[in-house]
Amino acid sequence: MIIYATEVETINSFVRLESLKELYSLVWIFVPIFSLVLGIITGVLVIAWIERELSAGIQQRIGPEYAGPLGILQALADGTKLLFKEDLRPSRGNTPLFSIGPSIAVISILLSYSVIPFSNHLVLADLNIGIFLWIAISSIAPIGLLMSGYGSNNKYSFLGGLRAAAQSISYEIPLTLCVLSISLLSNSLSTVDIVEAQSKYGFWGWNLWRQPIGFIIFLISSLAECERLPFDLPEAEEELIAGYQTEYSGIKFGLFYVASYINLLISSLFVTILYLGGWNISIPYISIPYISILELFERDPIFGTTIGIFITLAKTYLFLFISIATRWTLPRLRMDQLLNLGWKFLLPISLGNLLLTTSFQLFSL
């Protein structure tokens, strides 16, 4: 009986160990996801504060200064206010479409972060088709905006949703052609491989210098995809009140507010990855032992990951500065001007750039 009891206790201890292993594995699956979500929320708060301060400086006025030191908690206060506001719904609208629209817009943008490498050791999913996965997922967001506009049963909202769909289609094609040019130069669709291909040649190996035309087209197309001035036709205040957001209030309106900043952040991150070398730390005219730094990254992954995150975010916020300054300095385009720019100028130029890149790659074989 004593031996039998001992065997039972041993079996129970093994069962407990196996259950603990399964629990730990589940925890470690969700830890990077929650860390990424926390980082995104922090990034959105920082972007909102930078835009308020920068816009105040451009317009020569005082920005937020009461909520926290230098008004750094103003965005958090605005989000808290929207969280506790009443969630109104149009009485004659399509309630399912009206409710699902904001969620589709936010989730489709959040999923794009899964293929963004902050260093060669920090990426949720290093896929062979990572860059195309981002394009495919980002094309779902306009469907949510169109659903929101149609479900609101409001002519301003519906027109805003139609404008969002038309604008997305017009600028998604030039953006995709620019991505194809980068993929041809890197011989890969993986975001990690694209950054490593640029890192081989240091600063002058960045795709910014190898694809200057594609960089300008990608920059304009990404601003149009984010629906920022001068491309904010779907929510033009003077024409459509707030576009597809007209009937929204409370947390649903806050989701659109957050989605716009998340989309701006992810566009800036992809500009950094595709054209600015990602976590590449080479600086021109300054002698940096790049090989020794790579060896240090391999020896100490934690240090390499920390430095990679810092460099990637530094380049990203530099592009964010350009995007915010563009919003507060340029006037809004008309709808016909926006479509003409996309179809008559950016599309032919991006197609020509792709043909030139293809020819160069063929002759270099």
Curated annotation (Swiss-Prot):
Compartment(s): Plastid, Chloroplast thylakoid membrane
PROSITE patterns noted in UniProt: COMPLEX1_ND1_1 (PS00667), COMPLEX1_ND1_2 (PS00668)
Protein name (database record): NAD(P)H-quinone oxidoreductase subunit 1, chloroplastic
Enzyme Commission number(s): 7.1.1.-
Xref: InterPro entries: NADH_UbQ_OxRdtase_su1/FPO, NADH_UbQ_OxRdtase_su1_CS
NCBIfam families xref list: PRK06076.1-2
Gene Ontology molecular function, alphabetical: NADH dehydrogenase activity; oxidoreductase activity, acting on NAD(P)H, quinone or similar compound as acceptor; quinone binding
Keywords: Chloroplast, Membrane, NAD, NADP, Plastid, Plastoquinone, Quinone, Thylakoid, Translocase, Transmembrane, Transmembrane helix
Reaction(s) the record says it catalyses: a plastoquinone + NADH + (n+1) H(+)(in) = a plastoquinol + NAD(+) + n H(+)(out); a plastoquinone + NADPH + (n+1) H(+)(in) = a plastoquinol + NADP(+) + n H(+)(out)
BP terms from Gene Ontology: aerobic respiration; photosynthesis, light reaction
Gene, per the UniProt record: ndhA
Keyword check for Transmembrane helix: yes
